[in-house]
């Protein structure tokens, strides 16, 4: 079963050093080791890179963005018109923000019904099972 990995899992792993960030790093290690079949949107790079730059600066964001794009055993899913249409439907029928609708729509269309995220809003998306880290 494929698991969609939300941007916040990558962000916590890079930005912080606490119990939650350690759990995020362990989840990412499980992907690298092949114990977790994982996908995320290509758009996750945008969110990840933007937040890392805002907190740690442009140079670190460029380095971490390059590492992110080479992440082993992580499948990057495209943003298609089908994703946008599904995201728009989610936007109309849930309280999710636009970017979160894109993530949820990408997961649903890819059949990745387990959604690894620290964001509790995803627990209310029909068809997804939010899995906290």
Task: Locate the predicted segments by residue.
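Short, well-structured N-terminal submotif of metal-dependent ribonuclease cores
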Residues: 1-40, 53-63
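Acidic, PIN/NYN-like endoribonuclease modules and their adjacent C-terminal/linker elements
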Residues: 2, 104-133
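Histidine- and aromatic-rich ligand-binding microenvironments
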Residues: 5-6, 40-41, 96-97, 119, ...
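Alpha-helix capping/helix-boundary segments
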Residues: 9, 44, 83, 103, ...
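A general alpha-helix detector
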Residues: 9-10, 47-51, 86
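Active-site neighborhoods of divalent-metal-dependent phosphate/nucleic-acid chemistry enzymes
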Residues: 25, 74-116
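Structured helix-beta-strand junction loops
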Residues: 33-35, 71-72, 125
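Active-site-proximal, substrate-binding regions of enzyme catalytic domains
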Residues: 47-49, 53-75
